[in-house]
Design a protein with these regions (language model features):
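Short, small/polar-rich motifs associated with maturation and membrane association
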Residues: 1-289, 301-303, 307-309, 540
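Extracellular/periplasmic, surface-exposed regions of secreted and cell-surface proteins
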Residues: 4, 30, 77, 285, ...
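Coil residues (strongly favoring Ser/Thr
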Residues: 4, 96, 806-807, 866, ...
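Short, glycine/acidic-rich beta->alpha junctions
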Residues: 58-62, 103-107, 115, 126-129, ...
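A subset of solvent-exposed loop/turn segments in beta-rich extracellular surface proteins, enriched
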Residues: 169, 173-174, 183-188, 337, ...
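Extracytoplasmic gating/loop element in the C-terminal half of outer-membrane beta-barrel translocons
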Residues: 414-416, 423-428, 842-949, 953
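Outer-membrane beta-barrel transmembrane strand signature
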Residues: 82, 105, 130, 213-257, ...
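Conserved small-residue
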Residues: 159-230, 482, 489-498, 723-816, ...
Length: 994
């Protein structure tokens, strides 16, 4: 609504006096019971904002982008602001090279994971420079402002709400994998065709290859073999029933509020317990909030708010993925059996080492856990000095403490394979295997503790003066001081025994390890404990800012806005010229509908507003610096001296990233029932890039400014209310946006692998999107053997040269990120019944399909591990001459393997199967339409509520993630998640107030 008051974090101002691109949505309109945080509910709700999920596990934060990508090396997330307080990025001490931390990254959450959606009143998204410039350097990726519910000045009100949610369990009907019979016969056909294995299959009663070898070596009779074969064909183990579940979640919220005009209060407590679809993944969270308002005198208002949150998320060890295992494991395997996973020569004992594996055992004896405790307090003081002058002080403090751990016990295959060398409890202390093991007891534990505290202090002077009803002035002067300190430790220990009081058993001292071959050198595992096991970080970022805003409305139809902010950061320590970053914006709007001509002749045009803005935004990469970054290490073996490593050489010219923004918009409302907004924007960013350095610098690369990024786009929002009566109403909401993104000139050499991989952290080719990728050009299958063939890659050796651009023999496949997003919502009400629907649409992205040969070994030339299942697409592979007319799936790799041949630019070529996997034959549209929610609610009539002494009562039923329409070539996988699915869920809720 044009007359509503917009809370922009720093000030309250009428929307009609704002020129920037702003979208406000009410939290109650987007609540989805199957999600626990507000960021997960935003997909398809706002034009120009792309929300994509990376995992279906509970506790995982989605990826959010507003108006494309404006940085290559920096944080691309929007700035989150809660009740005027900037939420600092949560920094976690995780070693990027440590495999055990990968499972933790998925469940830690983000800046607003602590916030209970039930406490939120509305969400405002700021998109252009005029709207975001007031937030300075942190706002270059857009701003998401959250306003929590305010106190009521009424009698005591108590509200209770509850939601109970059931999520659907996955099943094999959703996917395209072979059943037991198909998998056994596929192995038989491959064996008959002479396809090789990377190593001789083990003798194992759980695999076809295992019993075939046992038959060949006369360990079983032909009759026994046939019986085992028939049993395997009909076993059809349902891994989804063993590893996943119908998840159950429940949420409860209690709130109280009341007070008078002099003093009001509100308090709320929320509890959520959510199970993931994978057995072992769950989240438990409790939140609390207290808000007090005191008005000792008419012109002075004091608000105090306290927030708290305690959360625990359980996940899996890095090598344990139930969903992936269920889809990729051979269904002939008995789920309770231990099958051979490794059978090889142990160089230390001089013996053949046999290790067995059972996934359920692996899952039950490993895991990861993330615990988070969040607390924040804010004080807001408003003093109305004059009727048109207000002073406001805002102070905020927050503390986020997290404890994370990932572990694997001595009972796991991981420990046996990586450290011990034999199955748990399979040898005696006097055996050669035991004496050769440096970790005969215990497993491994990775712990990570983080404490981040930040404060925010604001002093603002706001001027709001109406010279007459049609001329208004709004101005603001302010300063802000922000500081964020993150301290963390990470530690990895060996010998962890959780079932014996969580003790640590010391590894065997290297001098006591008895091995006939290859004894351990140095300290072995003990050396890792001292040199790599422990890590600590202590990082502080300080910002001092001064800002001002100006908004003037003349005759209620001509509006001018101006914003300026100056940020100073300690990131650019020594160079005072780069330490300060001014951001500014200007905007004009013309409310044509207020002109006399429209008022007299075109009254049905209730709103017609033209807007235009320009602004400059800055962005500081807090993890980069123009200074020398030297890491002091321990003692260098062999030299017996302390040593240091260079993380970054000095670059005094490194400065803030800068983005220039233009935005033009039109707001149109007809008959007060049809509202439309159309926006066009352009953005040009000078981003920090990574450049390669000569060998003599002693470091591979450095950061510098100079990566030009262009974004332009169109956004469209429509709201239509064709019927609005007392007992019946219908509302339709539609939003759509298209973003064109491309990189500027780049002089950095790129190899073939970079173009095939694509991505958006580097500019690959001028004029192409940042997420562009290329593929080999598929030329069909060889009719004689089913081998894939390709265009442009085979040239005479004398014509090959390192100077050849890889894109001359690769074909452009598109971009991995969607360039068109949309959302559609219907709201229908009949008396006390309401029906709401929500759809999201993402178009334009391209993805590589999962390859049916992905589990084949030896670069795709050898059969997969017998324990792996394979895609049913291989039933439609090339099998005989003539099949190449009907299929593009290569035949089994029985052709001679080509080794050592090169591409036109002399890069080494991959195998034919690997090239086919990265060819345009395997590129598919990643576009999809998802029905996110269908909700039905019933509101009890007031007279009925009075009979039960209730103020209100509502019952609601919701279905989330009902269906998704995407390319059939995904064969059941969700195009958003690629290798998993978003589970359908059903919920029943109650809301009652007294």
């Amino acid at each position: 609504e044009i007359d509503e008051v917009v809370v922009t974090g720093y000030q309250n101002i009428q929307r009609r006096d704002l020129v920037g691109s702003i979208t406000t949505i009410k939290a109650k309109d987007i609540i989805m019971p199957s999600y626990t945080t507000i960021d997960q509910m935003l997909q398809g709700r706002v034009a120009g904002m792309v929300v994509t999920n990376s995992s279906s596990r509970v506790g995982t934060a989605p990826k959010i982008q507003i108006r494309g990508t404006s940085t290559l090396q920096g944080n691309r997330d929007p700035l989150w602001v809660v009740d005027g307080i900037i939420q600092e990025d949560f920094q976690v001490t995780l070693d990027s090279g440590e495999l055990m931390t990968k499972s933790l990254k998925d469940i830690i959450g983000n800046q607003v994971s602590w916030l209970n959606p039930a406490d939120i009143e509305n969400i405002t998204i700021l998109k252009d420079a005029s709207a975001t410039a007031i937030y300075g350097s942190k706002a270059s990726n857009g701003v998401i402002e959250i306003t929590t519910k305010k106190n009521t000045t009424d009698r005591l009100t108590v509200n209770y709400s509850a939601n109970f949610n059931i999520g659907q369990r996955p099943n094999y009907g959703m996917f395209n994998f072979m059943n037991s019979q198909e998998r056994v016969r596929f192995s038989q056909e491959a064996f008959d065709a002479g396809v090789n294995y990377i190593e001789t299959p083990y003798k194992d009663l759980n695999t076809y290859e295992g019993i075939l070898r046992m038959l060949q070596e006369h360990d079983i009779s032909d009759i026994e073999y046939r019986k085992l074969y028939n049993d395997m064909e009909t076993r059809n183990t349902d891994w989804f029933k063993r590893l996943t579940r119908r998840s159950f979640s429940h949420t409860h919220n209690v709130s109280v509020s009341g007070g008078t005009n002099k003093f009001s209060y509100s308090a709320s407590i929320g509890y959520n317990n959510s199970e993931g679809q994978e057995i072992g993944n769950d989240n438990e969270r409790m939140t609390g909030r207290i808000a007090l308002m005191l008005r000792p005198i008419e012109k002075l208002t004091i608000n105090l708010t306290l927030n708290g949150s305690v959360s625990t998320t359980n996940g899996f060890f890095n090598e344990v993925n139930p969903m992936s295992y269920a889809t990729n494991t051979n269904r002939i395997i008995d789920p309770d059996a231990y099958y051979m996973q490794r059978n090889g020569y142990n160089s230390k004992t001089g013996k053949i080492q046999t290790l067995s594996y059972n996934f359920i055992n692996e899952r039950d004896n490993s895991g990861s856990k993330a615990r988070s405790n969040f607390m924040s307090a804010s004080l807001d003081v408003n003093w109305r000095i004059l009727d048109w002058v207000t002073y406001q002080f805002t102070g905020g403090y927050s503390n986020n403490n997290s404890t994370n751990e990932s572990w694997a016990t001595e009972r796991t295959y991981y420990i046996a394979n990586e450290y011990r060398g034999y199955d748990f409890n399979s040898v005696t202390p006097t055996s050669a295997e035991f004496k050769a093991a440096q970790l005969p007891f215990g497993g491994i534990l990775y712990t990570n503790d983080n404490n981040q505290y930040s404060y925010n202090i604001q002093n603002k002077l706001q001027f709001s003066k109406a010279f007459n009803p049609d001329n208004r002035l709004n101005a603001l002067l302010g300063m802000e001081l922000r500081s964020s300190t993150a301290k963390g430790t990470a530690n990895k220990v060996w010998g962890y025994v959780p079932d014996r009081g969580e003790r640590i058993v010391a590894p065997t001292i290297p001098s006591e390890v008895i091995t006939p071959n290859n004894p351990p050198t140095g300290w072995g595992i003990l050396g890792d404990i001292y040199s790599r096991g422990w890590q600590r970080t202590d990082n502080t970022n300080n910002f001092l800012s001064f800002f001002a805003t100006f908004a003037y409305s003349f005759k209620n139809r001509y509006v001018v806005n101006a914003n300026v902010r100056n940020d100073a950061s300690n990131v650019f320590g020594q160079d005072i010229n780069h330490r300060i970053d001014p951001t500014y914006s200007f905007g004009l709007s013309w409310r044509a509908s207020e002109e006399a001509f429209f008022q007299k002749h075109l009254k049905w045009i209730t709103t017609l507003n033209f807007r235009g803005t320009f602004g400059i935004q800055g962005n500081a990469l807090t993890r980069e610096s123009p200074e020398l970054i030297l890491s002091q290490q321990g003692v260098q073996p062999g030299y017996n001296r302390y040593f240091s490593t260079i993380g970054q050489i000095p670059n005094p010219y490194l400065s803030w990233e800068r983005t220039r923004n233009w935005n033009f918009g039109v707001d149109l409302e007809l008959f007060r029932m049809f509202y439309m907004n159309l926006e066009y924007y352009t953005r040009r960013s000078n981003a920090v890039i990574t450049v390669d350095l000569p060998f003599e610098y002693g470091i591979d690369d450095m950061k510098r400014n100079g990566g030009i990024i262009y974004n332009r786009g169109i956004e469209y929002t429509l709201s239509f209310t064709p019927i609005q009566k007392r007992d019946f109403s219908l509302n339709i909401n539609l939003n759509a946006s298209k973003n064109w993104n491309k990189g500027g000139e780049t002089k950095i050499d790129r190899n073939t692998a970079m173009y095939l991989r694509g991505g958006s952290t580097q500019i690959l080719k001028e004029g192409y999107p940042l997420s562009a990728f290329w593929s080999y050009s598929f030329a069909g299958l060889d009719g004689s053997n089913g081998k894939p063939m390709f265009n442009y890659v085979e040239v005479p050796d004398e014509e090959k040269s390192k100077s050849i651009d890889p894109t001359t023999y690769l074909v452009y496949s598109g971009e991995t990120e969607p360039y068109f997003t949309g959302g559609l919502g219907f709201s229908f009400r009949y008396k006390s019944l309401s029906l709401n629907t929500s759809f999201s649409l993402l178009l334009g992205s391209k993805k590589r399909l999962p390859s049916p040969y992905s589990d084949f070994q030896g670069s795709g030339s050898m059969m997969p591990d017998p324990t792996k299942n394979v895609n049913r697409d291989l039933l439609n592979r090339w099998q005989k001459p003539g099949d190449e007319v009907y299929t593009n799936i290569p035949g089994l790799p029985t052709w001679p393997i080509e080794i050592g041949w090169t591409l036109p630019n002399t890069d080494s070529a991959e195998s034919a199967i690997e090239m086919w996997e990265k060819s345009d034959a395997m590129v598919v549209s990643g576009s999809f339409l998802r029905c996110r929610n269908i909700g039905l609610s019933w509101q009890m009539k007031k007279e009925w509520c009075d009979k039960i002494h209730a103020k209100n009562l509502a019952i609601n039923f919701n279905m989330d993630n009902i269906f998704v329409i995407a390319s059939k070539r995904f064969n059941g996988f969700d195009p958003e998640l690629e290798n998993s699915i978003m589970p359908r869920s059903f919920s029943l809720g109650l809301n009652i107030g007294f």
